[in-house]
């Protein structure tokens, strides 16, 4: 069984500023730093943040049924501001999913606003079809909100220092 889910989060930041975080390892670092109750640790197992990079994401205690996942960056398109990562171990794969792909896009909406579009494409074995309900964009919505809030706060602090 195949499926896909998407979520859009509008934020008051320029697309280029968001992409500077989303296109690099900084997104993973900030995710663990800003959301320790969701992600306890992110380790780079291979690569430098480009295509082919392999991350091990360890979930905080209390995430039912999942302890960690490994994801490989399979696409980074700077022109389209698009990044894709494929789960290669753990996480949803331990729940009967045969494929779990995350797509993150930063869409320009205006001079100082953009949209973070999070998409999950998955395939789950028929015998585990009931587990399709575990597919979700919620973590990426939470991460997007935390990262954009962090960047806005940083921007605000810089403005205050200039006064």
Curated annotation (Swiss-Prot):
Keywords, comma-separated and alphabetical = Alkaloid metabolism, Lyase
The pathway is: Alkaloid biosynthesis
Expression (tissue specificity): Mostly expressed in bulbs, and, to a lower extent, in roots, stems, leaves and flowers.
CDD domains assigned to the protein according to its UniProt record, in alphabetical order: Bet_v1-like (cd07816)
A cellular component term, taken from the record's GO annotations: nucleus
Disulfide bridges in this chain:
none
Know the name of this protein? Norbelladine synthase
Q: Name one GO biological process term.
A: defense response
Domain of life per record:
Eukaryota
Under PANTHER family, the record lists: BET V I_MAJOR LATEX PROTEIN DOMAIN-CONTAINING PROTEIN, OS08G0374000 PROTEIN-RELATED
Q: Which residues bind tyramine?
A: 68-71
| Functional summary from the UniProt entry | Catalyzes the condensation of tyramine and 3,4-dihydroxybenzaldehyde (3,4-DHBA) to form norbelladine, the common precursor to all Amaryllidaceae alkaloids such as galanthamine, lycorine and haemanthamine, and including haemanthamine- and crinamine-type alkaloids, promising anticancer agents.
Q: In what way does activity depend on pH? A: Optimum pH is 4.
Reactions catalysed, semicolon-separated, are:
3,4-dihydroxybenzaldehyde + tyramine + AH2 = norbelladine + A + H2O
Q: Which GO terms describe its molecular function?
A: abscisic acid binding; lyase activity; protein phosphatase inhibitor activity; signaling receptor activity
The active site is formed by 83
What Enzyme Commission number(s) apply to this enzyme? 4.2.1.-
Q: Which InterPro entries match?
A: Bet_v_I/MLP, Plant_def-hormone_signal, START-like_dom_sf
Q: Which organism is it from?
A: Narcissus pseudonarcissus
* Pfam families documented for this protein: Bet_v_1
Q: Which family does it belong to?
A: Belongs to the BetVI family.
């Amino acid at each position: 069984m195949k499926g896909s889910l998407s979520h859009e989060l509008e934020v008051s930041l320029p697309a280029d500023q968001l992409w500077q975080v989303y296109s690099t390892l900084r997104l993973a670092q900030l995710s663990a730093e800003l959301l320790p109750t969701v992600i306890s640790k992110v380790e780079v197992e291979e690569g430098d943040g480009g295509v082919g990079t392999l991350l091990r994401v360890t979930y905080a205690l209390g995430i039912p049924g999942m302890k960690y996942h490994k994801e490989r960056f399979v696409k980074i398109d700077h022109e389209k501001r698009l990044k894709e990562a494929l789960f290669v171990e753990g996480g949803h794969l331990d729940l009967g999913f045969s494929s779990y792909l995350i797509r993150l896009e930063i869409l320009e909406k205006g001079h100082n606003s953009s949209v973070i579009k999070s998409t999950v494409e998955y395939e789950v074995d028929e015998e585990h079809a009931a587990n399709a309900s575990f597919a979700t964009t919620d973590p990426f919505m939470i991460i997007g909100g935390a990262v954009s809030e962090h960047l806005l706060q940083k921007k605000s602090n810089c403005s205050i220092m200039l006064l």
